[in-house]
Each structure stands twice: as structure tokens, then as C-alpha cells.
Design a protein with these regions (language model features):
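Alpha/beta-hydrolase active-site loop
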Residues: 1-20
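Primarily recognizes the serine-hydrolase "nucleophile elbow" in alpha/beta-hydrolase
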Residues: 14-84
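Loop/turn elements at helix/coil->beta-strand transitions in domains of secreted/extracellular proteins
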Residues: 25-27, 54-58, 165-168, 195-200
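Short alpha-helix in the alpha/beta-hydrolase fold that links the catalytic acid
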Residues: 43, 167-169, 181-191
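Accessory cap/linker subdomain of secreted extracellular hydrolases
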Residues: 62-162
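C-terminal catalytic histidine-bearing segment of alpha/beta-hydrolase fold enzymes
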Residues: 148, 153-154, 186-246
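Short beta-strand/loop motif that positions the catalytic acidic residue
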Residues: 165, 170-177
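Acidic catalytic loop of the alpha/beta-hydrolase fold
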Residues: 175-180, 210
Length: 246
């Protein structure tokens, strides 16, 4: 959820400066993947107003959930989609009074949804192991009504990533991502370019949503190199000029 996530990131950076013994520089680059990538985009958009004392040197968003509506719509086609759906339902029902379990979650499934929402996708194969641990051989059908309609649909749309970020931006996308789809991400990037955003965009062919950030992914080395360049104050390439044609 955009605004509170951005505020939490910036508050955490402020708090880190107060840690005794911490040797932090005066430059900050925000990283995030998936929903964290969406939070990184929101952080970049709100930083100037919310935390003018913390100028950002860059924002890195890997497979960001830039379009929550499209993300929710894709969940039925993804292994472990029920887990990602549970993350969304738990978050939105906790923040918005008009989004309720009763309206959107099938009767009898609520305990499973609440359990799934507390699990962390921390390593390869964890999606299947989580479902197995709950005695589920397949993804449970969670939604009682269309999650892209009504109050939840409205709230999802409100949390689409902003059209501009106040810092240099790197977006990385897995070419084989079935959750955050490459075509949807490309459309988002084109919108950013049209709004005048300065960015670099990299597609990693053969990488899915989680493999994009697993050990051995070329995206990891690229993120470190890009971040080091921002810390060094190097100019940013204008990736909008070099976007491959559709």
C-alpha cells in the first residue's frame, strides 16, 4: 500500500541515522522487489515532500508491483497465487475499512488466508512447501467475488505506482515473470518515459519473479554496480531513448 509503505521506508532511514555506531553516508538509494519494488517507487515519489532532509540518490525497483489491479488479475495463473492473494487481502483489509474479508473471501477459507499472509517467500520452492504444510495439494480458491471490482478494486487502483519518481530510477524485470508480467511492466515504463522520468530499464530473459533476485541472477550484480555509480555521483543514462521497439 503506497503512502504508508513509503513513509515507513523513509522513517526507517531516519531511524538508522540515530543508531549508535552506525557509519552511514549522506547518500541513500532505495531498493525493493515485488511489493517492495512498489514501495520503492512510492518512496521515490513522496521523498521530497515527506523527507526533504533525506535526498535520494536513486531508486531500484525489481519486478515492482506497479499495477496492483493487473497483479491481482494474474494470480489465478500463477503457482502459489493464493499466497500472493493472501498478502494483498490481509494488507488491504487492515488498512481500509471498506474492504472486508466477508465481501471478498470465500466462507471457510479465511483461516487459511490469514495463515498464508503471515508466511515469507524467502527461498526457492517455499511456495510449494507452504501449501504442503497446510495440507493443500493445490492453490485454494480464495475470492468469493471479483477482487478487481468494488471497494477492493478501487483501493488497488489508488495504489498503482506514481507516474514520476524524484530520483534516478532503475527498473529490472524478469522476462519469464508470470506474476508481474513483462508486457504490463513495459507499459508502465513507457508511461514513466512519457511523463519525463529519467530511468534505466533492464529485462532479464529466462528469469521469473523470484529467480530474478535469487543467488546467481545477473540482476544482483547490476543493482550493486548501478548503486555504486549513484553513490559516486555519476550521471544517469537516459534509458527511455534506448527502449527496444515493441
Amino acid at each position: 500500500i503506497g503512502v504508508p509503505s513509503a513513509h515507513a521506508v523513509l522513517d526507517a532511514r531516519r531511524a538508522a541515522s540515530e543508531l549508535s555506531g552506525a557509519r552511514l553516508g549522506d547518500r541513500t538509494v532505495v531498493w525493493g522487489h515485488s511489493q517492495g519494488g512498489g514501495a520503492a517507487l512510492w518512496t521515490g515519489a513522496l521523498a521530497d515532500d515527506y523527507a526533504p532532509d533525506l535526498p535520494l540518490s536513486g531508486v531500484v525497483a525489481l519486478a515492482p508491483a506497479s499495477d496492483p489491479l493487473a497483479l491481482i488479475d494474474a494470480l489465478t495463473e500463477v503457482t502459489g497465487g493464493s499466497i500472493f492473494a493472501s498478502f494483498a487481502v490481509a494488507a488491504y483489509t487492515s488498512i481500509y475499512d471498506d474492504v472486508t474479508f466477508r465481501e471478498y473471501v470465500r466462507p471457510g477459507v479465511e483461516p487459511i488466508v490469514r495463515t498464508l499472509s503471515r508466511r515469507c517467500l524467502s527461498e526457492p520452492g517455499v511456495v510449494v512447501s507452504i501449501l504442503t504444510s497446510l495440507g493443500l495439494s493445490t492453490d485454494p480458491e480464495i475470492f468469493a467475488s471479483d477482487p478487481t471490482a468494488g471497494p477492493l478494486g478501487t483501493r488497488l487502483e489508488q495504489n498503482a505506482a506514481p507516474a514520476t519518481v524524484s530520483a534516478p530510477l532503475l527498473i529490472g524485470q524478469g522476462g519469464d515473470d508470470t506474476l508481474v508480467r513483462p508486457d504490463a511492466q513495459r507499459a508502465f515504463v513507457e508511461g514513466l518515459c512519457a511523463s519525463g522520468q529519467r530511468l534505466e530499464y533492464a529485462v532479464y530473459e529466462g528469469r521469473g519473479h523470484i529467480p530474478l533476485v535469487e543467488r546467481g541472477s545477473p540482476a544482483i550484480a547490476d543493482v550493486f554496480a548501478w548503486t555504486a555509480a549513484r553513490f559516486a555521483g555519476e550521471p544517469v543514462d537516459d534509458g527511455c531513448r534506448s527502449l527496444p521497439q515493441r
